[in-house]
Amino acid sequence: MKRLIGIMAFVSMVLTLNAQVNAADSVMQHVKGNRLSVGGYGEVAFSRNFFSDHVSRYSQPEEHKDDPSHGRFDIPHAVIYLGYNFGKGWSLGTEIEFEHGGAGLAYEKEDEEGGEWEQETEKGGEVELEQFWIQKTFSRAANLRFGHIVVPVGLNNAHHEPLNFFTVYRPEGENTILPSTWHQTGVSFFGRYKKFRYEAQLLAGLNADNFTNTNWIKKGTANPLEFEVANKYGLALRLDNYSVPGLRLGLSGYYGESIGNSYPRNANGVDAEYKGQVIVGAFDFTYNSHNWIVRGQADYGYLGDAEQLKYVYNRTNKKSPYHHSAFVSKNAYAVGIEAGYDVFSQISRLRNENLKFYVFGRYEQYNPYASNTKNTAYDYTEVKRMAFGVNYYPVPEIAIKAEYSNRLLKSQYNNEPSVSIGVTYEGFFL
């Protein structure tokens, strides 16, 4: 991992000075001039996985190394954006998301429950409100946003639209250890000054009852209630620099307490004794110039009192919506880099028609259980992943993606190769 971080730092330093302006952080930031804005983004994906989907494939890898392949069709995200400019600096933004075409209730096989079926409540209703905010703009340097907002910690959350990554699905490392898209209710102050963009957010805290060994804090925002519990608070920060044309460098972080952020308050009876401090630090960059796009990120996280979470009441009571029986790690990390070159840039006719065809490669390494809590190991959580593929843009708003990928696990487990095809769009209609 140290070698990969070094490579990322070297790439970000040697990138050329003559570069195009980088893409905007979010689909909302493309809105200019219109009172009413309507747009969105979405993905349709097909995968063929050449490994076992049996729940015991990690506990009994030898028995499942020759299992047949399995396929999946999916609509990971379909998002409708509605925005309105009221005038005098006041505006409204919303994102309504249909995720996996679901209705908010899902059944899944739980590895830590010995393969039992478990119903997971992600959010009541057929759709999820990913964003809903009222914004007051005082100047380019000072804006306030109130409501349900995206938390821009890590590359994947700050740039989560499907044209901002080459792979068919969102980059796997960050998507494994952090909420994605991370969105919560809170207050945001942000702005731009010279070559910097900055943002600070006050949010409802995460809920440690939802943390797991295979996803770390990813499910910490999941909530089966009709309101967002805010006994504890979180603070998110982000700083981006655009000094070099075509190159964006970003730092982001999060701090908050997570134990006791449940309903009713202190349901676990340990609120005064344990805090469950969550600390996340992340570096990311995007380079877009000379027909190259290069993206990279490194995330590291710390969870205080991690060794206590297995024993708190909400995680041991089988009637609780937060029931989990596995230990949670004190540390987690995700590091990744991808690079793609536009082959059509070398063919004048195709270049003049604004067609693009990127050939890309990606490598990432991640582990949501990087520390063996109470000397309990889950070695299958340590993953190295390689992906190669293409992105074809028939028009700037649509990408047709194809990739081959392989998860490389520790030697006692079976690797997990797959082939995926996807069609994505991102744009505005009004």
PLM regions: where:
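N-terminal periplasmic/intermembrane-space "pro-region" immediately following the signal or transit peptide
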Residues: 4-11, 16-58
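Outer membrane beta-barrel
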Residues: 27-50, 68-208, 231-236, 240-248, ...
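Outer-membrane beta-barrel pore domains
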Residues: 31, 51-53, 64-67, 117-122, ...
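Solvent-exposed loop/turn segments connecting transmembrane beta-strands
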Residues: 72, 99-102, 179, 229, ...
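Active-site glycine- and acidic-residue-rich loops that bind
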Residues: 180, 226-233, 273-277
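Outer-membrane beta-barrel porins/channels
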Residues: 205-206, 214, 263, 330
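Loop-centered beta-sheet repeat module
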Residues: 210, 216-262
